[in-house]
Regions:
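Short acidic, glycine-rich loop/turn motifs
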Residues: 13-19, 40-42, 106-108, 121-123, ...
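Short, well-ordered strand-loop elements centered on a beta-strand within folded domains, enriched
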Residues: 36-40, 111-118, 146-154
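Cysteine/selenocysteine-centered motifs that mediate thiol-based redox chemistry or coordinate metal-sulfur cofactors
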Residues: 175-224
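Short acidic-glycine loop/turn motifs at beta-strand connectors
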Residues: 31-34, 107-108, 141-146
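A short, polar/proline- and glycine-enriched secondary-structure boundary/capping micro-motif
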Residues: 47-52, 128, 159-162
Length: 224
């Protein structure tokens, strides 16, 4: 397997039943056997479901609610979006049912705002970056790791009812929940690197990454 070099663009694609649900251009920070670490800044190029974009722009909860049925029946449409307001690092290990994100408030001195465990299918690496599928459930963790709370459990349950989250997914997520909490409690990687992650600053001279041509079709792996 070829490693990505720091500074290269890696594309995260969320793929459902062989079709791209979202795509995000990210900067590679480091890559190795333990994990791929990628960064995102305001201005990064994103393809996202139009219902999600509508919700972000208007706050219309009805638009957000429509997203899951559209996902379940394959009728979603994608629109262009630029990442806004926050920067984040994403720690993406192989063969694991979650990634760990560190979100920074760029309006407040690049302060580490929170950790965010995103439950997802194990990644399939591609020439463009990696493919996965967001399983709707998240764990939000305080910057000092002192407390955490589950997020979007109702959405996760609805995804199960609609068949977006399969029973096999659910069984894996139940195990991954316990694994993620143990990592926090035991301050294991990436949380052992808290000081490094707090100190991370992007290169201000580097342009925002863009999505490449063919992002919707190129090198799609097995149906996720």
């Amino acid at each position: 397997m070829a490693w990505f070099r720091p500074g290269e663009t890696a594309v995260r694609r969320d793929v459902f039943r062989g079709k791209v649900w979202s795509a995000q251009a990210l900067h590679v920070v480091e890559d190795g056997a333990e994990a791929l670490v990628v960064g995102c800044l305001p201005g990064a190029d994103v393809l996202a479901p139009t219902t999600w974009i509508e919700w972000l722009l208007t706050g219309d909860e009805e638009a957000r609610i429509r997203a899951l049925p559209n996902l379940a029946d394959g009728s979603w449409r994608l629109g262009r979006w630029s990442w806004r307001d926050t920067a984040h690092l994403q720690w993406v290990p192989p063969d694991t049912w979650f990634s760990v994100n560190a979100f920074y408030d760029v309006s407040d001195g690049h302060r580490l705002a929170n950790w965010y465990v995103n439950f997802q299918r194990p990644v399939h690496r591609t020439d463009l970056g990696f493919d996965t599928f967001d399983l709707l459930l998240d764990l939000v963790v305080a910057p000092d790791l002192s407390r955490w709370e589950w997020k979007d459990e109702d959405e996760y349950a609805h995804g199960r009812r609609l068949g977006v989250v399969s029973e096999a997914d659910h069984r894996a997520v139940e195990k991954a929940r316990a694994q993620a909490v143990r990592m926090i409690e035991e301050r294991r990687t990436p949380f052992t690197r808290e000081a490094d992650w707090r100190a991370w600053r992007p290169d201000p001279g580097r342009p925002s990454p863009s999505l490449p041509a063919g992002v919707l079709t190129s090198g799609l792996g097995p149906a996720l």
